[in-house]
């Protein structure tokens, strides 16, 4: 009896002691004026013995500390641009302690240049890196893009943004989507003076954010954290200008923010190559073939051609040449009651582009001795695009939620193209082609994602289901007139002319699902079990008709250039994952056992089918270790499979350029890729920021180009002849592809000139396998890019930035050992903005681009733009500016690239010099 009583007392004592260490402190941090939650605020809980617990607030401003012993603590909360909050809190021996904190803006902090300001230049908060916008001063009236360009580890160049060595795919505003995350719409239209901080992180998918397990779908994301005073009110900017050469530009953006409800209106129209949005232009991507773009045909990395890119990546930047753009959009964010959250946007844009491009190609002597290629291309392209996006979140209960995200877009593309290509052998004409093309494409994309999420009563146990469906359709018509000339050794020539109509219909359906179950195993470990299914069905129907000399109609079907092909790719995977999280260490290990079925069916001109089945083990691993508040290390590894596109599988000849024919390959296999990267971050209280990143990618069964050159005229089909000197390319699977990437960035302030300096060095290496004339080769490219940026941090009235980078390019092929493959790209820039007495403003941008080490000698140009303005009205809300573009009249667009057996030198048309007077009004 005594023994039993003793055990009872021991058990009660043990339970009591455990309860002492099982208390929870939670709360919400909000802005005093707007009452909105502050995202990524730093929360410290300091015990009586000095031990400090850290966390940060989530997207709702909430925080939580678990398993705390009872006692008295000091709660300290800091946030960029706000006064630090400090309070003594008592954790009871039982129950949960809740604290609601409101924070006030620190108006004095915004004008201080001190050690304290430097201390918040950049901070690590969990998996995020948060920059203090007040530590990077830009001129009043600047955009978010100007602010980002001054921050270490962020590169703004060529209409895209890179952060920590990766391209930024999404931009949020206070954790909320802004025009479906369109990068350019956010950074080019939002003013810099509303920004309190910039948060850089890898955004996981909605399902992964819920479960805590990565699914490989994370994208580099920037979250623009606005100042509390701008979360309720109206702000924006409108401007209009007209100048010489009939140049004009009109821009406007107005934002109505009222706590949870946010409405943004955008509009723009100009003919000066300004495109303040990303263009979702599937029709433009697919129609690029109408203007002469082709596999192996000549402008890899070229600037200013037709729309480039992958047809699965609809968001593309502005084109080369000269572009007129019009756009109009609305973004809506709101919370309907306590259960509904809605985000929606509509955007329309129209663009008209004229590109004139000259390409000069030199082949390696070992592959095509004495052979050169010259091409002139002119294309006129008009695009219309409508896109709708909605995101609905419904909180069914406190443990169950539903998210529905439908999308819809329409595109139309009209193009006119002229292409003149000439092959020369030892300086003498060998063969040439001239094509005139008229094309029209219509496309639509519709899709929807549905996510059901449930948290069970047991902590760590969740169940979630994701369902996704997408459908795309493109209908195109292309009319082409051909004139081909073949020269003989004795100087005689033979010409052939014909016309054809190409009708294409491309459809694709994609269905995906992901069922995930998580279970807490211990206080530090969680298990995930999942099942994934994905199916993509693609169809490409291409019919080519010749023009009859008798009827003058396109009524003669060319079977050798016609094909109907269907492909299907089904993957099923069972997945298991383990997540371990204890203090500063967080790791996740996962593995997918995937079964895949790749099917190809040729329907026309004759029936044929192929089927490939695969089994793959696809592991993944993520590890993050926070050495302390200022140092962190992250390691990530991913593996995945991908199927070849239907156009790569379709064995039909593309004769857009008769000198460079191409066709698909139905025998292609799926690709497997393995990607790993290691990243180290260090931020100090003295304002120093250091980022180091190294990564590698290996691809198995890489889809490479296999090209051969006709030594004599070759008949490929009864109606298609590969003329002497012309090339034929088709895709093949090859092993041996790998790439290496690395980046170092070091940023620090210099007080005596009140500026920030960012030093960076990136190094990239790629090994690309190819086949040329039956010989396997490797094309290797090494790029080293050192860069220095000096940005002022004086005041909003004086802003300057100076930068220089040297792109050291060493490219060589196993087909050629000749010199001339090394060149250096020099890029320098100086930017000055100054508001001086009587509200006068002066702005100047000076850019230099030069190439050295080329066979053509040194090529370079300067681009200098100036403006002088006068601010007036209350708070200097209005400004009149006189602007001059290309003062030195040197603007050019040229670039250089390398292929498996050639070098390209490319020049494009550019915007000519003009002067403009404009009016700008700031809404506050």
Question: Could you say what each language-model-derived stretch is?
Answer:
Residues 21-114, 122-124, 150, 155, ...:
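Periplasm-facing N-terminal accessory domains of Gram-negative outer-membrane beta-barrel systems
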Residues 62, 66, 76, 83, ...:
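Membrane-proximal, glycine/serine-rich, low-complexity loop/turn segments characteristic
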Residues 239, 315-318, 371-378, 430-438, ...:
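Extracellular loop and loop/strand-boundary signature of outer-membrane beta-barrel proteins
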Residues 211-212, 277-282, 355-371, 415-429, ...:
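Outer-membrane beta-barrel translocator domains and adjoining extracellular loop/strand segments
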Residues 376, 510-512, 556-563, 669, ...:
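Outer membrane beta-barrel strand-and-loop segments of large Gram-negative receptors
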Residues 526-630, 818-820:
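Signature of Gram-negative outer-membrane beta-barrel scaffolds
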Residues 233-243, 265-267, 594-595, 664, ...:
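Transmembrane beta-strand segments that form the barrel wall of outer-membrane beta-barrel proteins
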Residues 787-808, 820-924:
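Conserved C-terminal beta-signal and adjacent last beta-strands/turns
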């Amino acid at each position: 009896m005594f023994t039993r009583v003793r055990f009872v007392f021991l058990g009660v004592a043990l339970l009591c002691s455990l309860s002492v260490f099982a208390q929870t402190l939670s709360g919400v941090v909000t802005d005093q004026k707007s009452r909105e939650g502050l995202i990524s605020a730093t929360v410290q809980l300091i015990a009586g013995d000095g031990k400090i617990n850290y966390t940060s607030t989530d997207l709702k401003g909430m925080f939580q500390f678990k398993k705390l012993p009872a006692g008295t603590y000091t709660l300290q909360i800091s946030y960029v641009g706000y006064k630090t909050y400090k309070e003594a809190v008592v954790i009871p021996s039982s129950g949960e302690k809740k604290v609601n904190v409101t924070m006030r803006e620190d108006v004095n902090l915004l004008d201080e240049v001190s050690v304290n300001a430097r201390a918040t230049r950049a901070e690590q908060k969990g998996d995020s890196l948060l920059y203090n916008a007040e530590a990077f001063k830009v001129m009043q009236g600047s955009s978010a893009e100007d602010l980002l360009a001054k921050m270490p580890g962020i590169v703004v160049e060529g209409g895209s943004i890179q952060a920590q060595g990766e391209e930024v795919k999404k931009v949020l505003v206070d954790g909320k989507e802004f025009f479906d995350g369109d990068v350019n719409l956010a950074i080019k239209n939002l003013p810099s003076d509303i920004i309190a901080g910039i948060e850089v992180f890898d955004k996981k998918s909605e399902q992964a954010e819920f479960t805590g397990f990565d699914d490989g779908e994370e994208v580099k994301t920037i979250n623009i954290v606005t100042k509390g005073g701008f979360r309720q009110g109206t702000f924006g900017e409108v401007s209009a200008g007209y100048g010489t050469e009939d140049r004009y530009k009109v821009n406007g953006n107005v934002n109505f923010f009222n706590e949870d409800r946010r409405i943004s209106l955008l509009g723009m129209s100009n003919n000066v190559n300004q495109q303040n949005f990303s263009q979702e232009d599937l029709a433009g991507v697919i129609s690029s073939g109408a203007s002469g773009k082709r596999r192996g045909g000549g402008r890899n990395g070229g600037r200013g051609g037709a729309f480039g890119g992958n047809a699965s990546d609809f968001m593309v930047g502005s084109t080369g040449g000269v572009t007129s753009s019009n756009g109009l959009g609305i973004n809506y964010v709101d919370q309907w009651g306590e259960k509904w959250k809605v985000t929606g946007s509509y955007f329309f844009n129209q663009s008209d582009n004229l590109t004139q491009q000259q390409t000069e190609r030199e082949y390696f002597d070992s592959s095509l001795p004495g052979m050169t290629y010259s091409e002139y291309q002119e294309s006129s392209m008009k695009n219309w695009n409508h896109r709708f996006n909605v995101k609905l979140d419904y909180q069914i209960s406190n443990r169950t939620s539903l998210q529905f995200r439908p999308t819809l877009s329409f595109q139309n593309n009209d193009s006119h193209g002229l292409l003149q290509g000439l092959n020369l052998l030892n300086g003498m004409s060998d063969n040439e082609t001239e094509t005139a093309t008229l094309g029209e494409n219509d496309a639509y994309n519709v899709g929807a994602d549905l996510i059901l999420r449930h948290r069970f009563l047991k902590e760590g146990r969740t169940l979630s289901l994701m369902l996704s469906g997408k459908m795309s359709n493109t209908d195109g018509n292309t009319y082409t007139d051909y004139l081909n000339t073949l020269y003989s050794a004795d100087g005689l020539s033979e010409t052939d002319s014909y016309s054809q109509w190409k009708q294409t219909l491309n459809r694709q359906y994609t269905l995906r699902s992901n069922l995930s179950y998580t279970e807490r195993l211990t206080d530090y470990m969680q298990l995930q079990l999942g099942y994934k299914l994905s199916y993509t069905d693609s169809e490409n129907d291409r019919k080519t008709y010749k023009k009859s000399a008798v009827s003058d109609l396109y009524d003669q079907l060319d079977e050798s250039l016609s094909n109907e092909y269907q492909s299907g790719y089904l993957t099923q995977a069972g997945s298991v994952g383990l997540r371990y999280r204890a203090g500063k260490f967080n790791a996740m290990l996962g593995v997918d056992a995937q079964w895949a079925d790749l099917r190809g069916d040729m329907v026309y001109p004759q029936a044929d089918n192929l089927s490939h089945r695969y089994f793959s083990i696809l592991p993944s691993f993520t590890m993050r270790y926070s050495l302390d508040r200022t140092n962190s290390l992250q390691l990530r590894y991913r593996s995945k499979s991908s199927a070849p596109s239907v156009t790569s599988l379709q064995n039909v000849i593309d004769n857009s350029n008769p000198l460079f024919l191409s066709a698909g390959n139905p025998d292609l296999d799926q690709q497997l890729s393995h990607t790993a990267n290691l990243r180290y971050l260090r931020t100090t209280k003295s304002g120093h920021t250091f980022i180091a990143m190294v990564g590698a990618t290996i691809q198995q069964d890489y889809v490479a180009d296999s090209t051969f050159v006709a030594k004599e005229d070759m008949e490929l089909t009864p109606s298609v002849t590969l003329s002497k000197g012309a090339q034929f390319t088709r895709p093949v699977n090859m092993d041996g592809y790998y790439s290496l990437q690395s980046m170092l960035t070091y940023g620090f302030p210099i007080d005596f000139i009140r500026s920030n300096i960012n030093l960076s060095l990136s190094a990239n290496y790629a090994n690309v396998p190819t086949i040329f004339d039956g010989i396997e080769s490797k094309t290797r490219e090494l790029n080293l890019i050192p860069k220095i940026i000096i940005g002022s941090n004086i005041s909003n009235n004086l802003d300057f930035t100076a930068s220089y980078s040297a792109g050291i390019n060493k490219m060589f092929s196993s087909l050629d050992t000749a010199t001339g493959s090394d060149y250096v790209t020099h890029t320098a820039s100086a930017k000055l903005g100054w508001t001086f007495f009587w509200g006068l403003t002066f702005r100047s941008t000076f850019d230099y681009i030069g190439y050295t080490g080329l066979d053509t000698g040194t090529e370079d140009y300067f681009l200098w733009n100036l403006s002088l303005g006068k601010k007036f009205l209350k708070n200097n809300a209005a400004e009149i500016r006189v602007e001059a573009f290309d003062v030195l009249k040197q603007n050019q667009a040229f670039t250089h690239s390398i292929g498996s057996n050639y070098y390209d030198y490319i020049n494009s048309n550019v915007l000519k010099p003009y002067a403009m007077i404009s009016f700008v009004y700031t809404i506050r």
